[in-house]
């Protein structure tokens, strides 16, 4: 189990034990633990740091990034950062994982923040806004290369496949499309 995931300083991906393991927010980490290993922190919006880590280890499985950092103070990356980061991930055969919980579903003028740079994530994390804020819904979407690794019965959740949540999410997405909100 030598696989590692690159994450960015100032990130916010939630408050579970694994996630706070690589958080810089000491309030989130205080009084919790033990922490999960396997994460490498780099500066946000720093392509040189990303390539340095990618080129120095064959154990990197993914790069997890918020297209726009929210909790850190709403940091918008330099133009081209996301597309160049995605290209580096492809070069080193590493998954590009976009956490769009705070930015997704038309919050930035496009359906997804990564759409501003025509980036397609290998794994896309969505939440909150996918239902228009009226029902708790989240989703993890991935390409075939990722999803075909998971066999039926290997992954699940207590509330996965909730038909009410799915109907609400579909209705919210239809409104966004019909009203051209993204």
Residues covered by each model-derived region:
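Conserved N-terminal phosphate-binding loop of PLP-dependent enzymes in the Aspartate aminotransferase
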Residues: 1-182
